[in-house]
Amino acid sequence: MIRRPPRSTLFPYTTLFQSDELHFDDLDRELSRPTDLRIFSIAQAMEEGYTIERIHDLTKIDPWFLGKLKNIVDYKAKLSTYNKVEDIPADVMREAKILGFSDFQIARFVLNPTGNMEKENLAVRAHRKSMGILPAVKRINTIASEHPELTNYLYMTYAVEGYDVNYYKNEKSVVVLGSGAYRIGSSVEFDWCSVNAVQTARKLGYKSIMINYNPETVSTDYDMCDRLYFDELSFERVLDVIDLEQPRGVIVSVGGQIPNNLAMKLYRQSVPVLGTSPISIDRAENRNKFSAMLDQLGIDQPAWMELTSLEEVKGFVEKVGYPVLVRPSYVLSGAAMNVCYDDEELENFLKMAAEVSKEYPVVVSQFLENTKEIEFDAVAQNGEVVEYAISEHVEFAGVHSGDATLVFPAQKIYFATARRIKKISRQIAKELNISGPFNIQFLARNNEVKVIECNLRASRSFPFVSKVLKRNFIETATRIMLDAPYSRPDKSAFDIDWIGVKASQFSFSRLHKADPVLGVDMSSTRHILTLGHNTPLPDIPTIHHTDVLPHQSIQHGLVGLDKLAQTVVLTSQGIPFIYA
């Protein structure tokens, strides 16, 4: 079980062993400090010949546990003696799987490949299956094994044989991939989307199968679905579940970036991905392909170029000028996305982006300052937009959408701007033949509109706009993906008399040496939603609940009845004010 946590948390280092990305020069210091990297330093120490007694003296970890880790480290050395996957005998392969080695890790130690390793992973998988080495499916017993319990709470293991359940083969079933561990960038918003997709599938008579591993989520409550696989959201494990269940298809567009990143891999293995084609997902996620598509459609965007060499990028920067934005592909929450103001920052951030997005291109684009950012959340069917929501950021562009204060419906954009945004969004939806949820982010200055990016999945603002609009976008999207009937809204559904404000909460005060300056990478850990009949009224309690309170008082200019009404709200929230 010690092998799963690093993989499940999507930690940058998914094995216990040394790599080019992680190496400790002062091992004694790392071992003596209880950090999140200490387990990796223990593995390195064992590989370098440290005894269990010495590691125990430095870490104070019980020798029994250290001995179990030593077994894993020693087995890595055994796997490294083979040069071909086909040479691994059945007993060695089975023991490796019992010890928690993934197909990815076995391929790495035997073949020492480079790149995304998809081909090598599949070679290990094929060899393993040819020897009949498959994971068993067991029920999680929620009552301390006092007696057998017939729950649908499942996990996979190689330590035993046999299956505790019968599979839904040839039945009407669908797999929904969840959002994984809560962390900055992926939280309850995506879990809301996953739960609503599962509930909609059940309403339509489907057997719903959820794959997720976060015990804090609603989606991992086994009452939510017909079958819950409490297991990692890796390519290997998802294929294992699909091989056993043989569902009608897989929904990858409601769990955030993790499932979205699996779309093309599943497609290449002939797994039916429901909704928008994985080919279209790749055209949107791949920065180079998407920017080229916008140019082809004649849709305006900030000047851009693909990273080919540092010299060419610097030539591009000389033309457009600083600042520029470095943007890797297939990343969550703006990971390794940075604004560069000089050559030194450019070189450092390009290197960082290339490390995070090794398989896909990095794009450098002009960064436009003092512009408004606008979001278009929508659901489409066969390229036709069915329902949508246009919201605006209070902050200027450059603050991640997950950190920005969001106002819906947008209150301060020109009518011509809104019309242009809808036209562009319909063009993109048609070109990508979208069937399901999607989100497009725009820059606007005066009546000039430019596209930033498009995500062919539910965004973190889907719950927000669904609640404000009183239309469940995920239910509509799921019905479309399952070819089920749905209610198409009329134009009056988008003409509402209230305003929603979503503000972010941050944990800077609890994080040592945290930088409180907001940027293009996400930092917030929580969101607050309030409703009102004009923007200032909902905004005041929103600010109150984010703990951003004035130390003295708010200077309040009384101009109009709406300002007078705000004094009542200020008083009710305990916020002091003075008249001006």
For each feature predicted by the language model, list its residue ranges.
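Short, small-residue-biased leader/transition segments that mark boundaries at the very start
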Residues: 1-16, 580
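Periplasmic-binding protein-like
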Residues: 248-254
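C-terminal amphipathic alpha-helical interaction region
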Residues: 105-110, 115-164
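A conserved helix-loop-beta module that forms one wall/lid of the active-site cleft
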Residues: 276-337
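Short Gly/Thr/Asp-enriched flexible loops that form oxyanion-binding sites at enzyme active sites
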Residues: 257-270
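ATP-dependent carboxylate activation and anion-phosphoryl transfer catalytic cores
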Residues: 12-92, 96-100, 118, 131-135, ...
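Polybasic, low-complexity intrinsically disordered segments
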Residues: 542-543, 547-554, 559-580
